[in-house]
């Protein structure tokens, strides 16, 4: 019985093909050649993440009416790519752009003995799905993938909010910051674009993995919210000068000192910031942690090299009494 199936190309073009379930994959490739002019030996057809063998039939792969195959082109001669492990070792692989991620994992298993189900491959900050091809991710000659190992059973980490609530998350070291934000959204309903995650005083970049930041079992991240549009605050110096800064409540004190350095050329390690009589600590502490809001005024005093801060006691009292 005749039916229609579809073949999707790497350019997102969809080809509709009239077939019967007893057609071989070779027959299907011949039909694609008739429609698109692509030689049979340059075609690779993929369905449900599997590369289809020429001699098998559509029925063998349970390909039914309106199924979608993916058409990838076989590069003549293939190409080399590199896979970097967490230990810094680099593996060289011979591949084709039409190879699926499954195929790549099998090649890694052949070289390194790591079972595919324990592998996670990352490229350009994205975890690669098994059924997709290298071409789907625009992985080209001499591209470098990153290999991280999937921990059996994963691990637990904690996320602490500004309200001191602690969220427990089940993660793996290969999860990206994006993945973690999605898990937080599932639990707390906070959109990822409003989240900032801080660990060891550093803001985590979306495309990086937990392993990149050495985040391990039972580590604690700090969650601060990104204010849409930010806010202005002021910084008064001992000379009476007022600096205006554009900030967000999720900015760390380190971030604020960096902004002051940009404006005033004062090194962060020479700055001390005071608000409401309290010295602000570097690291993961944010403006929100100190309840610093729109148009708040901080006081800047300079740390003398090798000694105390000039005017520190005077300014502390001034701030405390204001």
UniProtKB/Swiss-Prot annotation:
One of its GO terms (cellular component) is plastid. GO terms for biological process: ubiquitin-dependent protein catabolic process. The keyword Repeat applies. GO terms for molecular function: mRNA binding. Residues 308-322 form a propeptide. It is found in: Cytoplasm; Nucleus. Ubiquitin is encoded by 16 different genes. Ubiquitin is generally synthesized as a polyubiquitin precursor with tandem head to tail repeats. Often, there is one to three additional amino acids after the last repeat, removed in the mature protein. Alternatively, ubiquitin extension protein is synthesized as a single copy of ubiquitin fused to a ribosomal protein (either eL40 or eS31) or to a ubiquitin-related protein (either RUB1 or RUB2). Following translation, extension protein is cleaved from ubiquitin. Ubiquitin exists either covalently attached to another protein, or free (unanchored). When covalently bound, it is conjugated to target proteins via an isopeptide bond either as a monomer (monoubiquitin), a polymer linked via different Lys residues of the ubiquitin (polyubiquitin chains) or a linear polymer linked via the initiator Met of the ubiquitin (linear polyubiquitin chains). Belongs to the ubiquitin family. This is Polyubiquitin 9. The gene is UBQ9.
